[in-house]
């Protein structure tokens, strides 16, 4: 079973996303901050991280950059209520981001994107 870490400072978002992914057949590891995400990654590698951008303390941008600096072999998808331009999205994809999901998301869209990324 493939492991996905869901990182968001909003527990309701983590719980909802976890439920959707578990129904889809994935094992989910929750994290509620950027710091917790990096700590858990050291102990338990995952195939994918669904990462909120705007969090108190260490932001999703900071976490993404740390993952790249440490050469951690995992895919990262940003989740955010903020819309980004296609140009900015392409820059992020070129830097190693796997995708970008707008919140609130449709559960089928989320599962389809995750399935495509992890196939």
Where are these regions (language model features)?
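Hydrophobic/aromatic residues positioned on beta-strands within the core alpha/beta folds
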Residues: 79-80
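Two-component/phosphorelay signaling modules centered on CheY-like receiver
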Residues: 11-29, 95
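Acidic, metal-coordinating helix/loop segments flanking the phosphotransfer/catalytic sites
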Residues: 30-48
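Alpha4 helix (beta4-alpha4-beta5 surface) of REC/receiver domains from two-component response regulators
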Residues: 62, 83-101, 108-112
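Receiver (REC) domain active-site loop signature in two-component systems and cognate sites
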Residues: 55
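Acidic catalytic/metal-coordinating carboxylates
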Residues: 32-33, 59-62
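Active-site residues of response regulator receiver
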Residues: 52
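Short amphipathic alpha-helix used as the core "switch/output" element in two-component signaling
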Residues: 39, 61-72
